């Protein structure tokens, strides 16, 4: 009988701490419901992943400050502006400046004929509706030519440039045509010698000076034909044109040595 009583007592003593722990856990869970939710979420997802709330973006301030409406200011009384007197019948005509601009833009302008047409048009609009009016094209006066470009050309004078006039009439020269200039000095010398060969001849000097020369050659002096007529007799006939060309090509001297006949 004693063993049957001791066994349930021992089991009851072992279950008491377990029941106490369960009661404590239940009371703690009822007091902290938020902690329970967090523990449940942690148990579902691994601890390495952290969930954060979405970042709320603050609204941008407006680029322009808000416009505050103010009540309109009281406008002062406007005085009527005096107008210049206009000629009769000129109210329905377009001004000259507008006509000029219309003419420049190639737009035809029209005007109504007579004041009766205007009255009829006004009456038509007020009573029966729009009425047709007769329009006639107005011929504008031609615009004056622009002379600014011509005036600028006349006023512009540049000293750095020369004004070249067209050769309308060729210049007539009264002077005789000059002889063609010779290009080389040798030809000029030969031509001069051909011209002067008739004026001068070479005659030997005195016998003493001829004997005194070392090489035995005689010296000659240019003497005019008029001063020495005897030498002119011994001068050979004038060379022909063909012989003169040969002399020029060979580079012969410009004078001839004539010896006095013994």
From Swiss-Prot:
<feature type="topological domain" description="Cytoplasmic">
    <location>
        <begin position="28"/>
        <end position="262"/>
    </location>
</feature>
<dbReference type="InterPro" id="IPR008359">
    <property type="entry name" value="Linker_for_activat_Tcells_prot"/>
</dbReference>
<dbReference type="GO" id="GO:0043303">
    <property type="term" value="P:mast cell degranulation"/>
</dbReference>
<dbReference type="GO" id="GO:0016020">
    <property type="term" value="C:membrane"/>
</dbReference>
<feature type="region of interest" description="Interaction with GRB2, GRAP2 and PIK3R1">
    <location>
        <begin position="200"/>
        <end position="203"/>
    </location>
</feature>
<feature type="region of interest" description="Disordered">
    <location>
        <begin position="206"/>
        <end position="262"/>
    </location>
</feature>
<dbReference type="GO" id="GO:0005794">
    <property type="term" value="C:Golgi apparatus"/>
</dbReference>
<keyword id="KW-0735">Signal-anchor</keyword>
<dbReference type="GO" id="GO:0042110">
    <property type="term" value="P:T cell activation"/>
</dbReference>
<feature type="modified residue" description="Phosphotyrosine">
    <location>
        <position position="110"/>
    </location>
</feature>
<dbReference type="GO" id="GO:0043410">
    <property type="term" value="P:positive regulation of MAPK cascade"/>
</dbReference>
<dbReference type="GO" id="GO:0002250">
    <property type="term" value="P:adaptive immune response"/>
</dbReference>
<feature type="region of interest" description="Disordered">
    <location>
        <begin position="69"/>
        <end position="115"/>
    </location>
</feature>
<keyword id="KW-0391">Immunity</keyword>
<dbReference type="Pfam" id="PF15234">
    <property type="entry name" value="LAT"/>
</dbReference>
<feature type="modified residue" description="Phosphoserine">
    <location>
        <position position="224"/>
    </location>
</feature>
<dbReference type="GO" id="GO:0001772">
    <property type="term" value="C:immunological synapse"/>
</dbReference>
<dbReference type="GO" id="GO:0019722">
    <property type="term" value="P:calcium-mediated signaling"/>
</dbReference>
<feature type="modified residue" description="Phosphotyrosine">
    <location>
        <position position="161"/>
    </location>
</feature>
<protein>
    <recommendedName>
        <fullName>Linker for activation of T-cells family member 1</fullName>
    </recommendedName>
</protein>
<feature type="modified residue" description="Phosphothreonine">
    <location>
        <position position="39"/>
    </location>
</feature>
<feature type="modified residue" description="Phosphoserine">
    <location>
        <position position="101"/>
    </location>
</feature>
<feature type="topological domain" description="Extracellular">
    <location>
        <begin position="1"/>
        <end position="4"/>
    </location>
</feature>
<dbReference type="GO" id="GO:0007229">
    <property type="term" value="P:integrin-mediated signaling pathway"/>
</dbReference>
<dbReference type="GO" id="GO:0030159">
    <property type="term" value="F:signaling receptor complex adaptor activity"/>
</dbReference>
<feature type="transmembrane region" description="Helical; Signal-anchor for type III membrane protein">
    <location>
        <begin position="5"/>
        <end position="27"/>
    </location>
</feature>
<dbReference type="GO" id="GO:0031580">
    <property type="term" value="P:membrane raft distribution"/>
</dbReference>
<dbReference type="GO" id="GO:0006954">
    <property type="term" value="P:inflammatory response"/>
</dbReference>
<feature type="modified residue" description="Phosphotyrosine">
    <location>
        <position position="255"/>
    </location>
</feature>
<feature type="modified residue" description="Phosphoserine">
    <location>
        <position position="106"/>
    </location>
</feature>
<keyword id="KW-0472">Membrane</keyword>
<feature type="lipid moiety-binding region" description="S-palmitoyl cysteine">
    <location>
        <position position="26"/>
    </location>
</feature>
<dbReference type="GO" id="GO:0019901">
    <property type="term" value="F:protein kinase binding"/>
</dbReference>
<keyword id="KW-1133">Transmembrane helix</keyword>
<feature type="modified residue" description="Phosphoserine">
    <location>
        <position position="43"/>
    </location>
</feature>
<keyword id="KW-1064">Adaptive immunity</keyword>
<keyword id="KW-0467">Mast cell degranulation</keyword>
<feature type="lipid moiety-binding region" description="S-palmitoyl cysteine">
    <location>
        <position position="29"/>
    </location>
</feature>
<dbReference type="GO" id="GO:0035556">
    <property type="term" value="P:intracellular signal transduction"/>
</dbReference>
<comment type="function">
    <text>Required for TCR (T-cell antigen receptor)- and pre-TCR-mediated signaling, both in mature T-cells and during their development. Involved in FCGR3 (low affinity immunoglobulin gamma Fc region receptor III)-mediated signaling in natural killer cells and FCER1 (high affinity immunoglobulin epsilon receptor)-mediated signaling in mast cells.</text>
</comment>
<feature type="modified residue" description="Phosphotyrosine">
    <location>
        <position position="156"/>
    </location>
</feature>
<feature type="modified residue" description="Phosphotyrosine">
    <location>
        <position position="220"/>
    </location>
</feature>
